[in-house]
């Protein structure tokens, strides 16, 4: 290429020497242009191998060194090349599209860079989020030159790379936008309305205005201060004033009107809810202790048991809270069917054998544990010889004796042998069941009242007065179920099975009956429909006793004539089971009732073994049940009653 002109003019002035340049190139190789400029500016250049081509440019005015350098940068920029300043007065010339991947000088306030010089600048943002500038800054930088722009959220800064002039223009825009917003707060005390309710309404109105798509800085917000019953508004002045006006319009005294409602309950008991609702109302009033007197109003809650309803008098906002509580409490509560099984087997064997001797002159060997003393029987025999009667003592002794007694009474000698073998077996199988509401205690008792001698007193006329009490024996079941999550039931159980012991197990001291009692008091967690053992006992006991005459009673074989032996063995097996079933709706309740009824009907038919067409009450003798909507159930009950009674209806 031909270098047409590349002159350097040095001109002198009266004050100082300065260098001025004039440039005119036509069809000149770009590398020749770079070499000429670098020589004039006394710069060392490093040219990328990809830099090639020709340029044509002409300057008609003289330029100083700074202007000449900017002219150099602008020419290269037009032809798609970029100058990267390096240390030691070195310039690196590369293609503009490769500039993003190379290191560039970091511009600061003292050295911001000028013109088309490529630099990197970090711009801090103080009042808004840096990411909000990312899109706009990136578009400006890309349009001016294919630079880069990004944001770093942890430090809230914008990082830009590009021409120094473009970056300076973008920074000016950022500084103008990054201004502190008007965040003044205005507090509005309320005299009549509740701050919470007013703020809720104002915020709802503001949500409706969001359709206008106003920027966030042009909107106002309002919050409630329940402690002082006031509202605080903040934001853009015009929007804040609009919010203040709305709050003042809503804070007006209302005309006196009735705040009494009658609420009819569907499931809950009105009297039970009064205490709960009164506590809730008192809690709401406590939260408003620092509110204005106009907001503090008395709450009255009464129950009308005849209609199962509540009469509530309260302020409108408190009334709404109470109605929500009532709606959550007045629900259909699930029920629990609790079935218990008591299975007990008792087996007792006893043997009592004794021999007693007596001599009117020498003495007696007597064993009172036999229940028949020889002295009493000899006295009765003497009286029988005299007047033909046994006497009261002998008659009483024989009346309370069980077993066999044999002996002789001749002259002064008498002998009495007693023997008793006893065996008792007691089987108990009981299946009490009861249905109760969740968290409601229920009691089931089946038994009888047994007289028990409590005390006796003998008067001066030898009259005996006895005090008798009644003790209930049988089956007692008390449960309180609590339904937990996942169909599990927490059961608080009090279960008792009691009975009167048989005569062989009772004391012979005539102090009254002996009672067998089995009691369980515990709490178990059971899944609905599962059967668990809540208690059990396996017991075996053997009692052996011997009363004998010293020395004589130890003689082999003959020793049995001078002693009394007693042996008793008892075995007992007791198990207590329980099964809860949750009943949540009508269909489950009907299913449980039908199952129980059919089980009862089948058991009765099995025990009675009533043949078809035999006996029973006549149809016209039966108590007529209304056949309204369930004829099938009526027919089932009718057939069961007929099967229960014997033939002839008696």
From Swiss-Prot:
The keyword Phosphoprotein does not apply. It comes from the Bacteria. Residues 182-255 are annotated as: N2. Residues 258-330 are annotated as: N3. Residues 20-115 are annotated as: N0. GO terms for cellular component: cell outer membrane; type II protein secretion system complex. It is found in: Cell outer membrane. It holds the Pfam family Secretin. Residues 587-650 are annotated as: S domain. Residues 117-181 are annotated as: N1. Residues 1-18 form the signal peptide. Residues 335-585 are annotated as: Secretin. The record marks 447 as: May serve as a pivot that allows opening of the central gate for substrate egress. Keywords: Cell outer membrane, Membrane, Protein transport, Signal, Transmembrane, Transmembrane beta strand, Transport. One of its GO terms (biological process) is protein secretion by the type II secretion system. PANTHER family: PROBABLE GENERAL SECRETION PATHWAY PROTEIN D, SECRETIN GSPD-RELATED. Involved in a type II secretion system (T2SS, formerly general secretion pathway, GSP) for the export of proteins. Required for the translocation of the multiple pectic enzymes. This subunit forms the outer membrane channel. Forms a cylindrical channel with 15 subunits. The N0, N1, N2 and N3 domains are periplasmic, while the secretin and S domains form a channel that is partially inserted in the outer membrane. The N1, N2 and N3 domains each form a periplasmic ring. The secretin domain forms a double beta-barrel structure; the outer barrel has a diameter of about 110 Angstroms while the inner barrel forms the central gate with a small pore in the closed state. Belongs to the bacterial secretin family. GSP D subfamily. This is Secretin OutD. It comes from Pectobacterium carotovorum subsp. carotovorum (Erwinia carotovora subsp. carotovora).
């Amino acid at each position: 290429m031909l270098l047409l002109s590349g002159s350097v003019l040095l001109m002198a002035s009266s004050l100082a020497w300065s260098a001025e340049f004039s440039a005119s190139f036509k069809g000149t190789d770009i590398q020749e242009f770079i070499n000429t400029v670098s020589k004039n500016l006394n710069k060392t250049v490093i040219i990328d191998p990809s830099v090639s081509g020709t340029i044509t440019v002409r300057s008609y005015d003289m330029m100083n060194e700074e202007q000449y350098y900017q002219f150099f940068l602008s020419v290269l920029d037009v032809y798609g090349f970029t100058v990267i300043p390096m240390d030691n007065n070195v310039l690196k010339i590369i293609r503009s599209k490769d500039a993003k991947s190379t290191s560039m000088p970091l511009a600061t306030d003292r050295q911001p860079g000028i013109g088309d010089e490529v630099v990197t600048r970090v711009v801090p943002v103080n009042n808004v989020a840096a990411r909000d500038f990312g899109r706009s800054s990136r578009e400006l930088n890309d349009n001016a030159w294919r630079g880069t722009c990004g944001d770093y959220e942890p430090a809230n800064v914008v990082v830009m790379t590009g021409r120094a002039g473009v970056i300076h223009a973008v920074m000016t825009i950022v500084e103008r936008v990054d201004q502190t917003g008007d965040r003044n707060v205005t507090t509005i005390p309320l005299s009549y309305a509740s701050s919470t309710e007013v703020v809720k309404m104002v915020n709802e109105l503001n949500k409706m205005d969001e359709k206008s798509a106003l920027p966030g800085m042009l909107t106002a917000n309002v919050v409630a201060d329940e402690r002082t019953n006031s509202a605080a508004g903040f934001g853009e002045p015009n929007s804040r004033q609009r919010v203040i006006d709305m709050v003042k319009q809503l804070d007006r005294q209302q005309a006196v009107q009735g705040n009494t409602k009658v609420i009819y309950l569907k499931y809950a008991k009105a009297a039970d809810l009064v205490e709960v609702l009164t506590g809730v109302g008192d809690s709401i009033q406590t939260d408003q202790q620092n509110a204005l007197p106009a907001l503090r109003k008395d709450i009255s809650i009464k129950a009308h048991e005849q209609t199962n309803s509540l009469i509530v008098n309260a302020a409108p906002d408190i009334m709404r809270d109470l109605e929500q509580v009532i709606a959550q409490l007045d629900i259909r509560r699930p029920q629990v069917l609790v079935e218990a099984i008591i299975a007990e087997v008792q087996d007792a064997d006893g043997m009592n054998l004794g021999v007693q001797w007596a001599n009117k002159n020498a003495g007696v060997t007597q064993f009172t544990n036999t229940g028949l003393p020889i002295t009493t029987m000899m006295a009765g025999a003497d009286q029988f010889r005299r007047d033909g009667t046994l006497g009261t003592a002998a008659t009483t002794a024989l009346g309370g004796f069980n077993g066999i007694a044999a002996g002789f009474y001749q002259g002064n000698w008498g002998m009495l042998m007693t023997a008793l073998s006893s065996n008792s077996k007691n089987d108990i199988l009981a299946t009490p069941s009861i249905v109760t509401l969740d968290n409601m205690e229920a009691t089931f008792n089946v038994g009888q009242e047994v007289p028990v001698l409590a005390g006796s007193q003998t008067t001066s006329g030898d009259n005996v007065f006895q005090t008798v009490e009644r003790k209930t024996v049988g089956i007692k079941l008390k449960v309180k179920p609590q339904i937990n999550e996942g169909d599990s039931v927490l059961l608080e159980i009090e279960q008792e099975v009691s009975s009167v012991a048989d005569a062989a197990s009772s004391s012979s001291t005539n102090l009254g009956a002996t009672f067998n009692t089995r009691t369980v008091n515990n709490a178990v967690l059971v899944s609905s429909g599962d059967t668990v053992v809540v208690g059990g006992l396996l017991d075996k006991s053997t009692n052996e006793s011997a009363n004998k005459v010293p020395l004589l009673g130890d003689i082999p074989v003959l020793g049995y004539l001078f002693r009394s032996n007693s042996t008793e063995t008892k075995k007992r097996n007791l198990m207590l089971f329980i099964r809860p079933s949750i009943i949540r709706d009508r269909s489950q309740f009907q299913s449980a009732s039908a199952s129980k009824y059919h089980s009862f009907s089948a058991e009765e038919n099995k025990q009675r073994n009533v043949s078809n067409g035999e006996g029973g009450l006549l149809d016209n003798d039966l108590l007529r049940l209304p056949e309204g909507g369930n004829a099938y159930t009526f027919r089932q009950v009718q057939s069961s009653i007929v099967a229960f009674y014997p033939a002839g209806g008696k």
